Amino acid sequence: MIFEKPEDLERERNAIEKFVSLFGGSYQKLGQFDIDFKVFDKDKTLIAYVEVKGRKKDMSNAYPLPISLEKVSKLVGKRLNPVVVWACTDGIIYGKVYELTGEVKWGGRPPREGSVNDDELMIYYPKQKGFKYLKF
């Protein structure tokens, strides 16, 4: 069952567009059970894979930044520059997975009817040098 609402998809789109605007790139949305995006440079060369996570907080109050360990594993499995972008209310926080250090623990969100993976192994990233910030 897919739980993304239209506003979640809009937040995701705004975040990826802000990210690729850094270098005049483009993106391609991947399948619903894959990570979120392939990212291309201005010459249409594949340069990264990106997972976008919604965070309904301002960047200054967003920490620790959560993400499913399974999502990170799938992202790293793509091998080419795995990047996570957290879409906050006032901008994006992003970083290359290989440059980040987080704490793994059981967590997630309150279970929703029809969901089998709301409680799962999560990575929680504290504020650190590997993160970059862009305001909307």
Model-derived features: positions:
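Acidic-basic catalytic patches of nuclease active cores, encompassing PD-(D/E)XK
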Residues: 1-31
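Conserved catalytic cores of phosphodiester-cleaving nucleases, focusing on short active-site segments
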Residues: 37-58
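A structural signal for short, well-ordered beta-strand segments and their strand-loop junctions
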Residues: 29, 49-51, 83-87
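Non-catalytic C-terminal interaction segments of nucleic acid-processing enzymes
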Residues: 3, 21, 40, 87-136
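Structural alpha-beta junctions
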Residues: 21-25, 76-83, 104-105
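Short acidic/glycine-enriched loop/turn segments that link adjacent beta-strands
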Residues: 31-35, 91-92
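Short, charged, amphipathic alpha-helix that recurs within catalytic cores of restriction-modification
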Residues: 59-88
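Generic structural signal for beta-strand residues in well-ordered domains
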Residues: 30, 42-43, 75-77
